[in-house]
């Protein structure tokens, strides 16, 4: 996720509070022997604006608030499509009766429990062994949900999408009547931008909050017999991306493959940072869902606003985050309709991210529940829509 200059103020606190790796942990932090190498990477900071940088220069850009896509391994992303997919979304939500009992089943306590475990890893840095371990733990949770729901008997499954850097992305699939696909995404990795390979990075908000938000939405979605039996019009996928912090690496790899193989993705929603509200409240503003309006599909975004109005108990606020601010940018570049929602107006979002201070105690689980309601409402409505 993004990094603001305000986060630089957390440097001294981060260095003071973040423990260096203890003796018994030293073999686990980094998969690659060199924490920072002289290898150069091709990044894109705006559409068509590219430059070569070292790894340390990547982190310096992030510390200074510059988002980018690292396109070194995916330079072809977006070049194979002749035009963007044009999808006609429903004019309004229509499945309120079916969704009412599902929405009531969403659980703050389950999100809290999952996030407690997820943030207990020293870091989820994508090049670290902890990043690999956290991804394996998360895949196990997803597979257990599918098995416990009996959805595996109807073809639902979850798997790793493998990457070269150690931490793999995760894709959970619930087949529908057609191969046309609706994707819900969050990123699983975390980072401490001051010393990524050493300092702790609990990543509670960025993006542990989004990770457990969509995990909880998946759990409840799987209680729908119509969904697990494949009666939905469209196939549903939940993605947990690796290496978002390194330049949207995991999501680029996935959507590059989807573009190459002609996958028909009708919609993609990214949930990145869903739990922090204190700055909004301190500013005297009402709690709200931040709906990103730049570099997104306007029609999907308009439908998401209707979903918030129908299924959430708080309002939305329109806001902007710039180019490549989260993984929806990878789907968009591949030509797929994508959207992004965040915890607040962007200016009030969490400034503890990318430090050791991004911890569970600063999050509002009632607010995360609103994001889970949005996720569940959207994916259920689109599962049965003729897109």
UniProtKB/Swiss-Prot annotation:
Assigned EC number: 3.4.11.-
UniProt main location, coarse: secreted
One BP annotation, GO: proteolysis
InterPro entries: M28_fam, Peptidase_M28
A Pfam family: Peptidase_M28
Role summary: Extracellular aminopeptidase that allows assimilation of proteinaceous substrates.
Name of the protein described by the UniProt record: Leucine aminopeptidase 1
Cofactor note as given: Binds 2 Zn(2+) ions per subunit.
Necessary cofactors: Zn(2+)
PANTHER family according to UniProt: AMINOPEPTIDASE YDR415C-RELATED, METALLOPEPTIDASE M28 FAMILY MEMBER
Family statement: Belongs to the peptidase M28 family. M28E subfamily.
Cell compartments where the protein resides: Secreted
Organism (species): Sclerotinia sclerotiorum (strain ATCC 18683 / 1980 / Ss-1)
């Amino acid at each position: 996720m993004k990094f603001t200059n305000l986060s630089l103020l957390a440097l001294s606190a981060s260095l003071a509070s973040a423990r260096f790796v203890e003796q018994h942990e030293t073999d686990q932090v980094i998969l690659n022997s060199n924490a920072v190498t002289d290898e150069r990477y091709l990044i894109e900071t705006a559409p068509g604006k590219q430059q070569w940088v070292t790894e340390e220069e990547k982190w310096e850009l992030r510390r200074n608030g510059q988002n980018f896509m690292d396109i070194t391994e995916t330079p072809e992303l977006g070049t194979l499509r002749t035009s963007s997919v044009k999808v006609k979304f429903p004019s309004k939500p229509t499945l309120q009766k079916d969704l009412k009992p599902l929405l009531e089943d969403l659980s703050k306590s389950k999100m809290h429990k999952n996030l407690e475990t997820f943030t207990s890893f020293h870091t989820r840095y994508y090049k670290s062994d902890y990043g690999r371990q956290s991804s394996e733990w998360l895949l196990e949770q997803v597979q257990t949900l599918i098995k416990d729901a009996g959805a595996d008997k109807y073809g639902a499954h979850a798997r790793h999408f493998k990457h070269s850097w150690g931490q793999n992305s995760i894709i959970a699939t619930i087949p529908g009547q057609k191969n046309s696909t609706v994707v819900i995404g969050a990123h699983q990795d975390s980072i401490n931008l001051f010393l990524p390979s050493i300092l702790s990075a609990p990543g509670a908000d960025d993006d542990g909050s989004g990770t457990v938000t969509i995990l909880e939405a998946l759990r409840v979605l799987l209680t729908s017999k119509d969904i697990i039996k494949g009666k939905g019009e469209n196939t549903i996928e939940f993605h947990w991306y690796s290496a978002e912090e390194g330049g949207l690496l995991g999501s680029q790899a996935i959507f590059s493959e989807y573009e190459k193989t002609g996958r028909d993705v009708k919609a993609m929603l990214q949930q990145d940072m869903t739990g922090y509200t204190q700055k909004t409240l301190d500013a005297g503003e009402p709690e709200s869902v931040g709906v990103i309006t730049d570099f997104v599909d306007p029609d999907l975004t308009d439908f998401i606003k209707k979903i918030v109005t129908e299924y959430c108990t708080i309002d939305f606020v329109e806001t902007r985050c710039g180019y490549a601010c989260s993984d929806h940018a990878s789907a968009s570049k591949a030509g797929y309709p994508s959207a992004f929602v965040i915890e607040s107006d962007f200016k009030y979002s969490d400034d503890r991210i990318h430090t050791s201070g991004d911890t569970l105690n600063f999050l509002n689980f009632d607010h995360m529940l609103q994001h889970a309601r949005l996720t569940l409402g959207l994916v259920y409505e689109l599962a049965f829509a003729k897109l």
